[in-house]
Amino acid sequence: MIQQETYLNVADNSGAKKLRVIRVLGGFHKKYGTVGDIVVCSVRDAIPNSDVKKGDVVRAVIVRTKKEIRRSDGTYIRFDDNAAVLIDKFNAPRGTRIFGPVARELREKGFMKIVSLAPEVW
């Protein structure tokens, strides 16, 4: 359950380290985001001399949440942190590597490039 003002870790090598959610995209009444949702974020912490600077407004896709996700077979999955991957306007990742596991729900939402770069898919 990612909402406005939530801080997210960055799970790629784009240069950002921490993000703060400005808006969850997907409709006027969409309050919460979960795995696979696109959010608009502000970069709160970044690596020096990277393409992404502190204060930049970026789009990101949520790849891990601490709040459990119920799957259609009745199982639940949750992660140790809230994390996102920075994407461009074509929904392609801005970084070239993904760190940590990502949820299988990303494949169903069409983020195949992120799934293929991830070391583990849960």
Curated annotation (Swiss-Prot):
Keywords: Ribonucleoprotein, Ribosomal protein, RNA-binding, rRNA-binding. SUPFAM superfamilies: Ribosomal protein L14. Gene3D superfamilies: Ribosomal protein L14. It holds the Pfam family Ribosomal_L14. One of its GO terms (molecular function) is structural constituent of ribosome. One of its GO terms (biological process) is translation. It comes from the Bacteria. GO terms for cellular component: cytosolic large ribosomal subunit. Belongs to the universal ribosomal protein uL14 family. Binds to 23S rRNA. Forms part of two intersubunit bridges in the 70S ribosome. Part of the 50S ribosomal subunit. Forms a cluster with proteins L3 and L19. In the 70S ribosome, L14 and L19 interact and together make contacts with the 16S rRNA in bridges B5 and B8. This is Large ribosomal subunit protein uL14. It comes from Thermotoga neapolitana (strain ATCC 49049 / DSM 4359 / NBRC 107923 / NS-E).
